[in-house]
Regions:
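Bacterial N-terminal signal peptides that target proteins for export
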Residues: 2-12
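C-terminal motif of bacterial Sec signal peptides marking the signal peptidase cleavage site
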Residues: 19-22
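N-terminal edge beta-strand
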Residues: 47-78
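Short aromatic-acidic-glycine turn motif
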Residues: 98-109
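N-terminal low-complexity, Pro/Thr/Ser-rich intrinsically disordered segments
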Residues: 29-56
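Extracellular/periplasmic metallocenter environments
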Residues: 24-39, 64, 115-162
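Short beta-strand and strand-turn-strand segments in soluble, beta-rich domains
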Residues: 108-116
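Beta-strand cores of secreted/periplasmic/IMS beta-sandwich domains, seen most often
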Residues: 68-93, 128-137, 161
Length: 162
């Protein structure tokens, strides 16, 4: 049996596959708000009755958020449940929205993190994450999944804070 060296197209496909495999965004939480984020988070979240938090659920699956349009009211506490019903990991990413909210807690399969600043939230296939937050700044913000090609295939949405 004669072995042939790998061809350029084969190597290119292999390299592209490895690049995509390494591009998963992962969950990124900052313990201190980066520049541009809402400040005084601890005081904001401690002043709220979390028993009154409004529940909102978003389902993520292959190339869609359901619902893909979300609306929140400033100063109202929310418990956002993100259910990944897909077969692959998805992210819930909205840089502008993350900068405009005070986060009390993020709960993932690994446990809970108190008062983080969200940078990116990745939900593995079949798992559920919960974000408890208060919207602080009004605006309309883009929402997208930042896994490779997901937003290109329509996994986008919008978040409005009134």
């Amino acid at each position: 049996m004669i072995q042939r060296p790998a061809t350029l197209p084969t190597l290119s496909i292999l390299a592209f596959t490895l690049i995509l495999a390494g591009c998963g965004a992962g969950t990124d939480l900052a313990q201190r708000p980066p520049p541009g984020y809402v400040g005084d988070v601890a005081a904001r979240v401690s002043a709220v009755d979390w028993a009154q938090a409004r529940p909102v659920t978003v389902q993520l699956d292959e190339f869609r958020f359901q619902p893909d349009r979300l609306a929140f009211e400033r100063g109202t506490p929310y418990r956002l449940t993100l259910e990944n019903r897909g077969n692959v990991a998805h992210t819930f990413t909205s840089e502008g929205f993350f900068k405009a909210i005070a986060v009390r807690r993020v709960t993932t399969a690994q446990g809970a993190v108190e008062t983080p600043a969200l940078v990116n939230l990745e939900i593995p296939a079949g798992q559920t994450d919960v974000v408890e937050f208060i919207p602080v700044e009004a605006g309309t913000y883009d929402l997208a999944c930042h896994e490779p090609l997901h937003s290109s295939f329509g996994m986008t949405g919008a978040i409005t804070v009134r």
